[in-house]
């Protein structure tokens, strides 16, 4: 299932007046509560939100819609988020899109596995408002145009 939700305030896309507060963000998350919270936080910050509930739909949306940032759940049904991220990073059409892992994994070595798959950062669940937006803003500011 895929939804495209505009930001609450609207805004231009990466033109002369683009800012990191107006990004197109793809969320790949199968948990409805986590998805709803992420959508709310992103829209409240002025971002346009695209959503997918599995990795395959996320890969298709990433190729077709070219988001500014992808938030990828690690534990997805079927193909997991690390495998999907590795595929995104091997594809010339999507390799430059920053991917931030959304994960409840907090064991020693998990960050290394997440980075090795190609993720540019990660956010631990449960999502904390300030940490969530700080990581996203940092990635958007440093992402290539």
Sequence positions of predicted segments:
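Hydrophobic alpha-helical motif in two-component signaling modules
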Residues: 62, 71, 84-85, 89, ...
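The feature encodes the CheY-like receiver
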Residues: 77-80, 95, 107
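Conserved acidic carboxylate
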Residues: 29, 53
